[in-house]
Amino acid sequence: MMTRKKLADLAELAVQESPFTKMSLDNLANEEIIRRQLQVEIEKHFRSKEAASGLVERIRKVTGATMNRARTAAQTERTRALNGKRVSDAIRKYLDEYDKAAEGHRKRPEMPVFQWVNPRTAKEPRHEHVAISGDKRPLGEEFLPGLRYPGDPQAPAHQTINCHCYLRRAR
């Protein structure tokens, strides 16, 4: 963890610590603490299998966010976690089958194929997500530029925040 002291030591290498630098370093340290606390609460939520409202309350407790912001963050994190797990599990299974096929000199397994599903539960669904609902892609291929699956952490935020979509295994 990058502590305030470590950040301050790093800053002193380049310049003397000014009041502005001190304030900036304090903010960075606080953001890191909140980010870590939030990650812990999200993990606790998924381990406990509590209702979605539980995650909203956990987010509010850590961040002090309004109810609407906490709901948006909770929906975003649920989408990211659930679809990320589906993709991760599919990758692991594919690689296991691939290794077994290589050991036994058998035919390589087919790449898993996923279907994008927009459940239309959002008040204002993204037009791009509605348009690709039902589309199928092999694992790892993009459904939209930069978007491999709903909640993809490497995708642009405007494609993932408050997304209600999910992947369904098609093959």
What are these regions (language model features)?
Residues 1-160, 168-171:
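Domain-core detector
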